[in-house]
Regions:
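Conserved class I S-adenosyl-L-methionine
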Residues: 1-51
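Class I SAM-dependent methyltransferase SAM/SAH-binding core
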Residues: 52-99
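A short acidic, Gly/Pro-enriched loop at the edge of an enzyme's catalytic core
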Residues: 100-110
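A short SAM/SAH-binding and catalytic strip from SAM-dependent methyltransferases
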Residues: 109-125
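A short glycine-rich, Lys/Arg-flanked "PGG" loop and its adjoining helix->strand segment in the class I
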Residues: 128-140
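SAM-dependent methyltransferase
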Residues: 145-215
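C-terminal lobe and adjacent flexible extensions of AdoMet/dcAdoMet transferase-like proteins
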Residues: 209-251
Length: 251
């Protein structure tokens, strides 16, 4: 159920960091933070959808000043409860339109969106607005990095629109795609040991790499790098995800 925290209320925030998914593994977080620290180049970083600080906190420990934008107060409270969480500034709001005052500390050398978070913006207009918002916060030469999946439409059998992506003895999850609008919804079903079930759904809008490049162009940014992941392996037709970096021209 959606509330003022969007789809990431207290129930989600409480268990968010207990995920066993690949993006939550320490070695993956370390690689992610290493690349982001290099892209920041000694400047400030802006995380869109900072959440519980999974990436922001270790990045800050590397000496990179981090500020976040986050809609969910519950997720921010989770970050505040962690060591170092109180020191990170957060602006509460939609990261497509929320602005950060840069008059005191200057513009950012890096903005970033990880773990498919660009897809939480459920319209093309909002995704374009996000790029423009980022461009307004970046210093000349600054970078915008996005980690996002490549839409898995090749997995959908002809005539179907459902792709399961998780099954276990206590739960399952699947995505329902609308290939006309590029809208999709992830459905999560869980059953406790005593047989009590729960379900939640999260909508998103999937987006293609070339579409992201056009959004960047509309915002005055240009593609600098695109990799298969944080190990900087080449992006190919078989890549299931990509890390893309766009740059704000110096002049």
């Amino acid at each position: 159920m959606i509330d003022e925290d969007g789809y990431f209320g207290e129930d989600v925030a409480e268990r968010y960091d207990r995920s066993s998914g690949p993006s939550f593994q320490p070695d993956v977080i370390e690689r992610t933070v290493q690349v982001l620290a290099e892209l920041a180049g000694g400047g400030r970083a802006l995380e869109l959808g900072i959440g519980t600080g999974r990436i922001a906190l270790p990045l800050a420990r590397r000496g990179v000043p981090v500020h976040g934008i986050e809609l969910s107060r519950a997720m921010v409270a989770g970050m505040r409860a962690k060591p170092g969480g109180e020191a990170i500034g957060v602006s509460i709001g939609d990261f497509a339109t929320t602005t950060v005052d840069t008059r005191a500390d200057g513009a950012f050398s890096l903005a970033y969106l990880v773990f498919n978070t660009i897809m939480n913006l459920t319209s093309q207009e909002a995704q374009v607005a996000c790029f423009r918002n980022v461009a307004a916060h970046l210093e000349p030469g600054g970078c915008f990095a996005i980690e996002v999946m490549v839409p898995e439409l090749r997995k959908i059998p002809a005539g179907q629109n459902i792709v399961p992506f998780h099954t276990s003895p206590t739960g399952w999850a699947y995505t329902v795609y609308d290939t006309v609008t590029q809208d999709a919804t992830c459905h999560y079903v869980e059953v406790t040991e005593d047989g009590v079930g729960s379900a939640r759904s999260v909508p998103f809008r999937y987006v293609w790499p070339a579409e992201l490049d056009l959004m960047a162009q509309l915002a005055g940014l240009r593609l600098r790098d695109r990799w298969d992941g944080w190990t900087r392996e080449p992006f190919t037709e078989d890549s299931a995800q990509h890390v893309s970096v766009w740059e704000k021209p110096v002049s």
